[in-house]
């Protein structure tokens, strides 16, 4: 879960998958905790909560490059292999099944999916996995039966855009985050040169509230 207690400090870090989660796991003074522990700390210890967010277009691109390109391209199918949940949630819309399709079939289907096709699939399943859900859901999750709301008062919530250098410098100063641990797992995977207007419209619709809440500009072209 993407919640971290900042050691030796009355502070928490909250993020989403594909928003520096891997980097935070490598940070020595960040201790990963579960949602219920974060909720208890917020309620009883009144920490400052540092929340990192990402441009929704870049987050979608990063997930596509990781789950639909990097992982299948590097999968060793000569050994037992299990596809990750943020891949499997797409399978029904792709007509795939781990019971009826071979890993090779699935590998090729993922790799051969264009980014625009990925976005159309995303619209059919984005609520099914935390990697692809709207970022603001982590603060107040509509699908959780328990602990829907983390209960963070506005005055104790600091929001940082990971794509803004000034924001991340402020985040590092506030939390002790070491930039040398920053991971870029998909840096070598080619980024699609252009996002179609149809895909932009779909991303705008899915993540509309993220654009509003975190002051990201929507694109139409």
Regions found by a protein language model. Name each.
Residues 50, 57, 64, 207, ...:
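Aromatic side chains
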Residues 35-51, 58-191:
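PAPS-dependent sulfotransferase catalytic domain
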Residues 23, 27, 166-174, 202, ...:
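Amphipathic alpha-helical segments that form well-ordered structural scaffolds
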Residues 1-56, 62-63, 70:
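PAPS-dependent sulfotransferase catalytic core
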Residues 30-33, 177, 216:
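Short aromatic/hydrophobic-glycine micro-motifs
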Residues 6, 13-17, 21, 160-164, ...:
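Aromatic-acidic/polar surface patches that form glycan- and anion
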Residues 156, 179-221:
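Charged phosphate-binding loop/patch that engages nucleotide di/tri-phosphates or the phosphate backbone
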Residues 3-9, 151-154, 196:
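Short, surface-exposed loop and linker segments with low hydrophobicity and enrichment for Pro/Ser/Thr
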């Amino acid at each position: 879960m993407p919640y971290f207690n900042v050691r030796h400090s009355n502070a928490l870090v909250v993020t989403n998958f594909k928003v520096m989660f891997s980097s935070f796991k490598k940070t020595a003074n960040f201790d990963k905790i579960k949602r219920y522990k974060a909720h208890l700390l917020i309620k009883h210890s009144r920490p400052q909560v540092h929340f990192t967010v990402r441009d929704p277009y870049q987050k979608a691109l990063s997930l596509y490059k990781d789950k639909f390109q990097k992982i299948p391209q590097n999968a060793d199918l000569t050994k037992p292999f299990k596809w990750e949940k943020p891949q499997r949630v797409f399978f029904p819309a792709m007509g795939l099944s781990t019971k009826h399709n071979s890993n090779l079939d699935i590998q090729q289907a993922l790799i051969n999916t264009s980014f625009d096709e990925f976005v159309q699939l995303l619209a059919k399943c984005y609520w099914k996995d935390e990697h692809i859900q709207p970022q603001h859901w982590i603060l107040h999750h509509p699908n959780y039966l328990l602990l829907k709301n983390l209960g963070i008062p506005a005055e104790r919530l600091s929001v940082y855009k990971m794509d803004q250098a000034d924001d991340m410098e402020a985040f590092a100063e506030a939390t002790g985050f070491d930039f040398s641990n920053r991971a870029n797992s998909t840096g070598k995977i080619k980024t699609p040169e252009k996002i179609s207007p149809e895909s932009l419209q779909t991303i705008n619709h899915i993540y509309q509230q993220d654009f509003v809440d975190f002051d990201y500009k929507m694109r139409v072209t």
